[in-house]
Amino acid sequence: MKKENDNKYAQITTEQCKQILQKLVQINTCQPEGNEGKLADVILEMLPENIVYKKINHSKTRASLIIKVNGETEEGGIAFVGHMDTVACGDYSQWSYPPHDAIVKGDILYGRGSADMKGGDAAMILALKWMLETKKRPKKSIYFCFTADEESKGSGICGIVKDGTVNKVDEIIICEPSDEKIGTCEKGAFWLKITVQGKQSHASRPDLGINAVEYVEKLVAQLKEQVETGEVHPILGTTTASVTKLCGGIMTNIIPPTAEAELDIRTVPGVSHEHILKCTEEIAGRFRKEILGIQITIEVMNDRPALETSKDSPLVKQIMKTAQMVGISTEDKGHYFYTDASQIIPEISVPFVIAGPGDDALAHCINEHISLESVRRYAKLYQKYLEKYYL
């Protein structure tokens, strides 16, 4: 494997990574408040005043940011995408270091969002700064998109899609943590809420009631059996269906009249969410016919498709070649969680990869942390990819 040792790329240092990443982590952008507008301003302060950018406001405190490096043509180009929000910190007392102090110990920076995914944001900023310093006009435009609300409903990337600024790009790099590999696929998410209305009775006379808790459990069990026995993806494995919330019951001696279950179904490419919904409706339909008086409602809470980019696409071939040059593994990786790709790729239908610093297994964890060398390595990946294919 060729190691990166070209002096042209030596200007990106771990010290630069540390300085930028500390500034990002020290801004609290935890859900549900977000406060990404403040972080967008901090990012702009790191860059020259004459850059081309658009700030898309979602509320008084929440915003997304698009920075554009104009190309020789307006058609095509590439977009780097990273989100600015993070999940909540949880119990602060469980952290070894305050989650927004961005403490560095050796090569490791600790803090909420360090891996997911302000490390990726820092790598994007370093690549952007390098791009601006070259003072060269790329063949096609290059976009750096910093989004809000990825950890919830995705209002940031949806706002960017609605704005249309990046909708003509040829390819997208999602800068989420990919564990020193290149991701070419991600699971979809299909969340269902199933509510059963039965009939209340004394628990000593279950024959006079309709036990909503028991029937919601039976419905979910039948659905899981159908969903989890489908096709196997070579990287992502199988579709999974997990009951993540179950509510019902009044007292021990009362047959429960209502019950509610929420399912988090993670699908692999090729599995139709419409088909899963149809299966759910069919099971519910059988229950309605067999149990006189039972009522069942099904609500779709989240619907994001599974995505995959062909290994034969130019983007995958080129990014793998570039990864090898900077010491990143060319092993295929799949992501079990969804990213901003789930809300932009279906709209513009272009190839994408997931390639960013850090270990995705540390996302959302207590004592979340990232290697500064990993941030530097991915900054150089973006830099070298742009130098090779866009300058």
Labelled PLM ranges:
Residues K105-D107, A127-Y143, L223-H233, E373, ...:
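Phosphate-handling active-site elements
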Residues C89-K105, K168-V169, T184-T195, K321:
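Acidic-glycine-rich active-site phosphate/pyrophosphate-binding loop
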Residues M117-W191:
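Acidic/histidine-rich catalytic neighborhood of metal-dependent amide-processing enzymes
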Residues K2-N5, I12, T29, K54, ...:
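Metal-dependent amide/peptide-bond hydrolase catalytic core
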Residues D107-A123, H202:
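Glycine/serine-rich anion-binding loops at beta->alpha junctions
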Residues K2-R112, E133-P138, S349, D359:
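Acidic/His- and Gly-rich active-site-bordering loop/insert found
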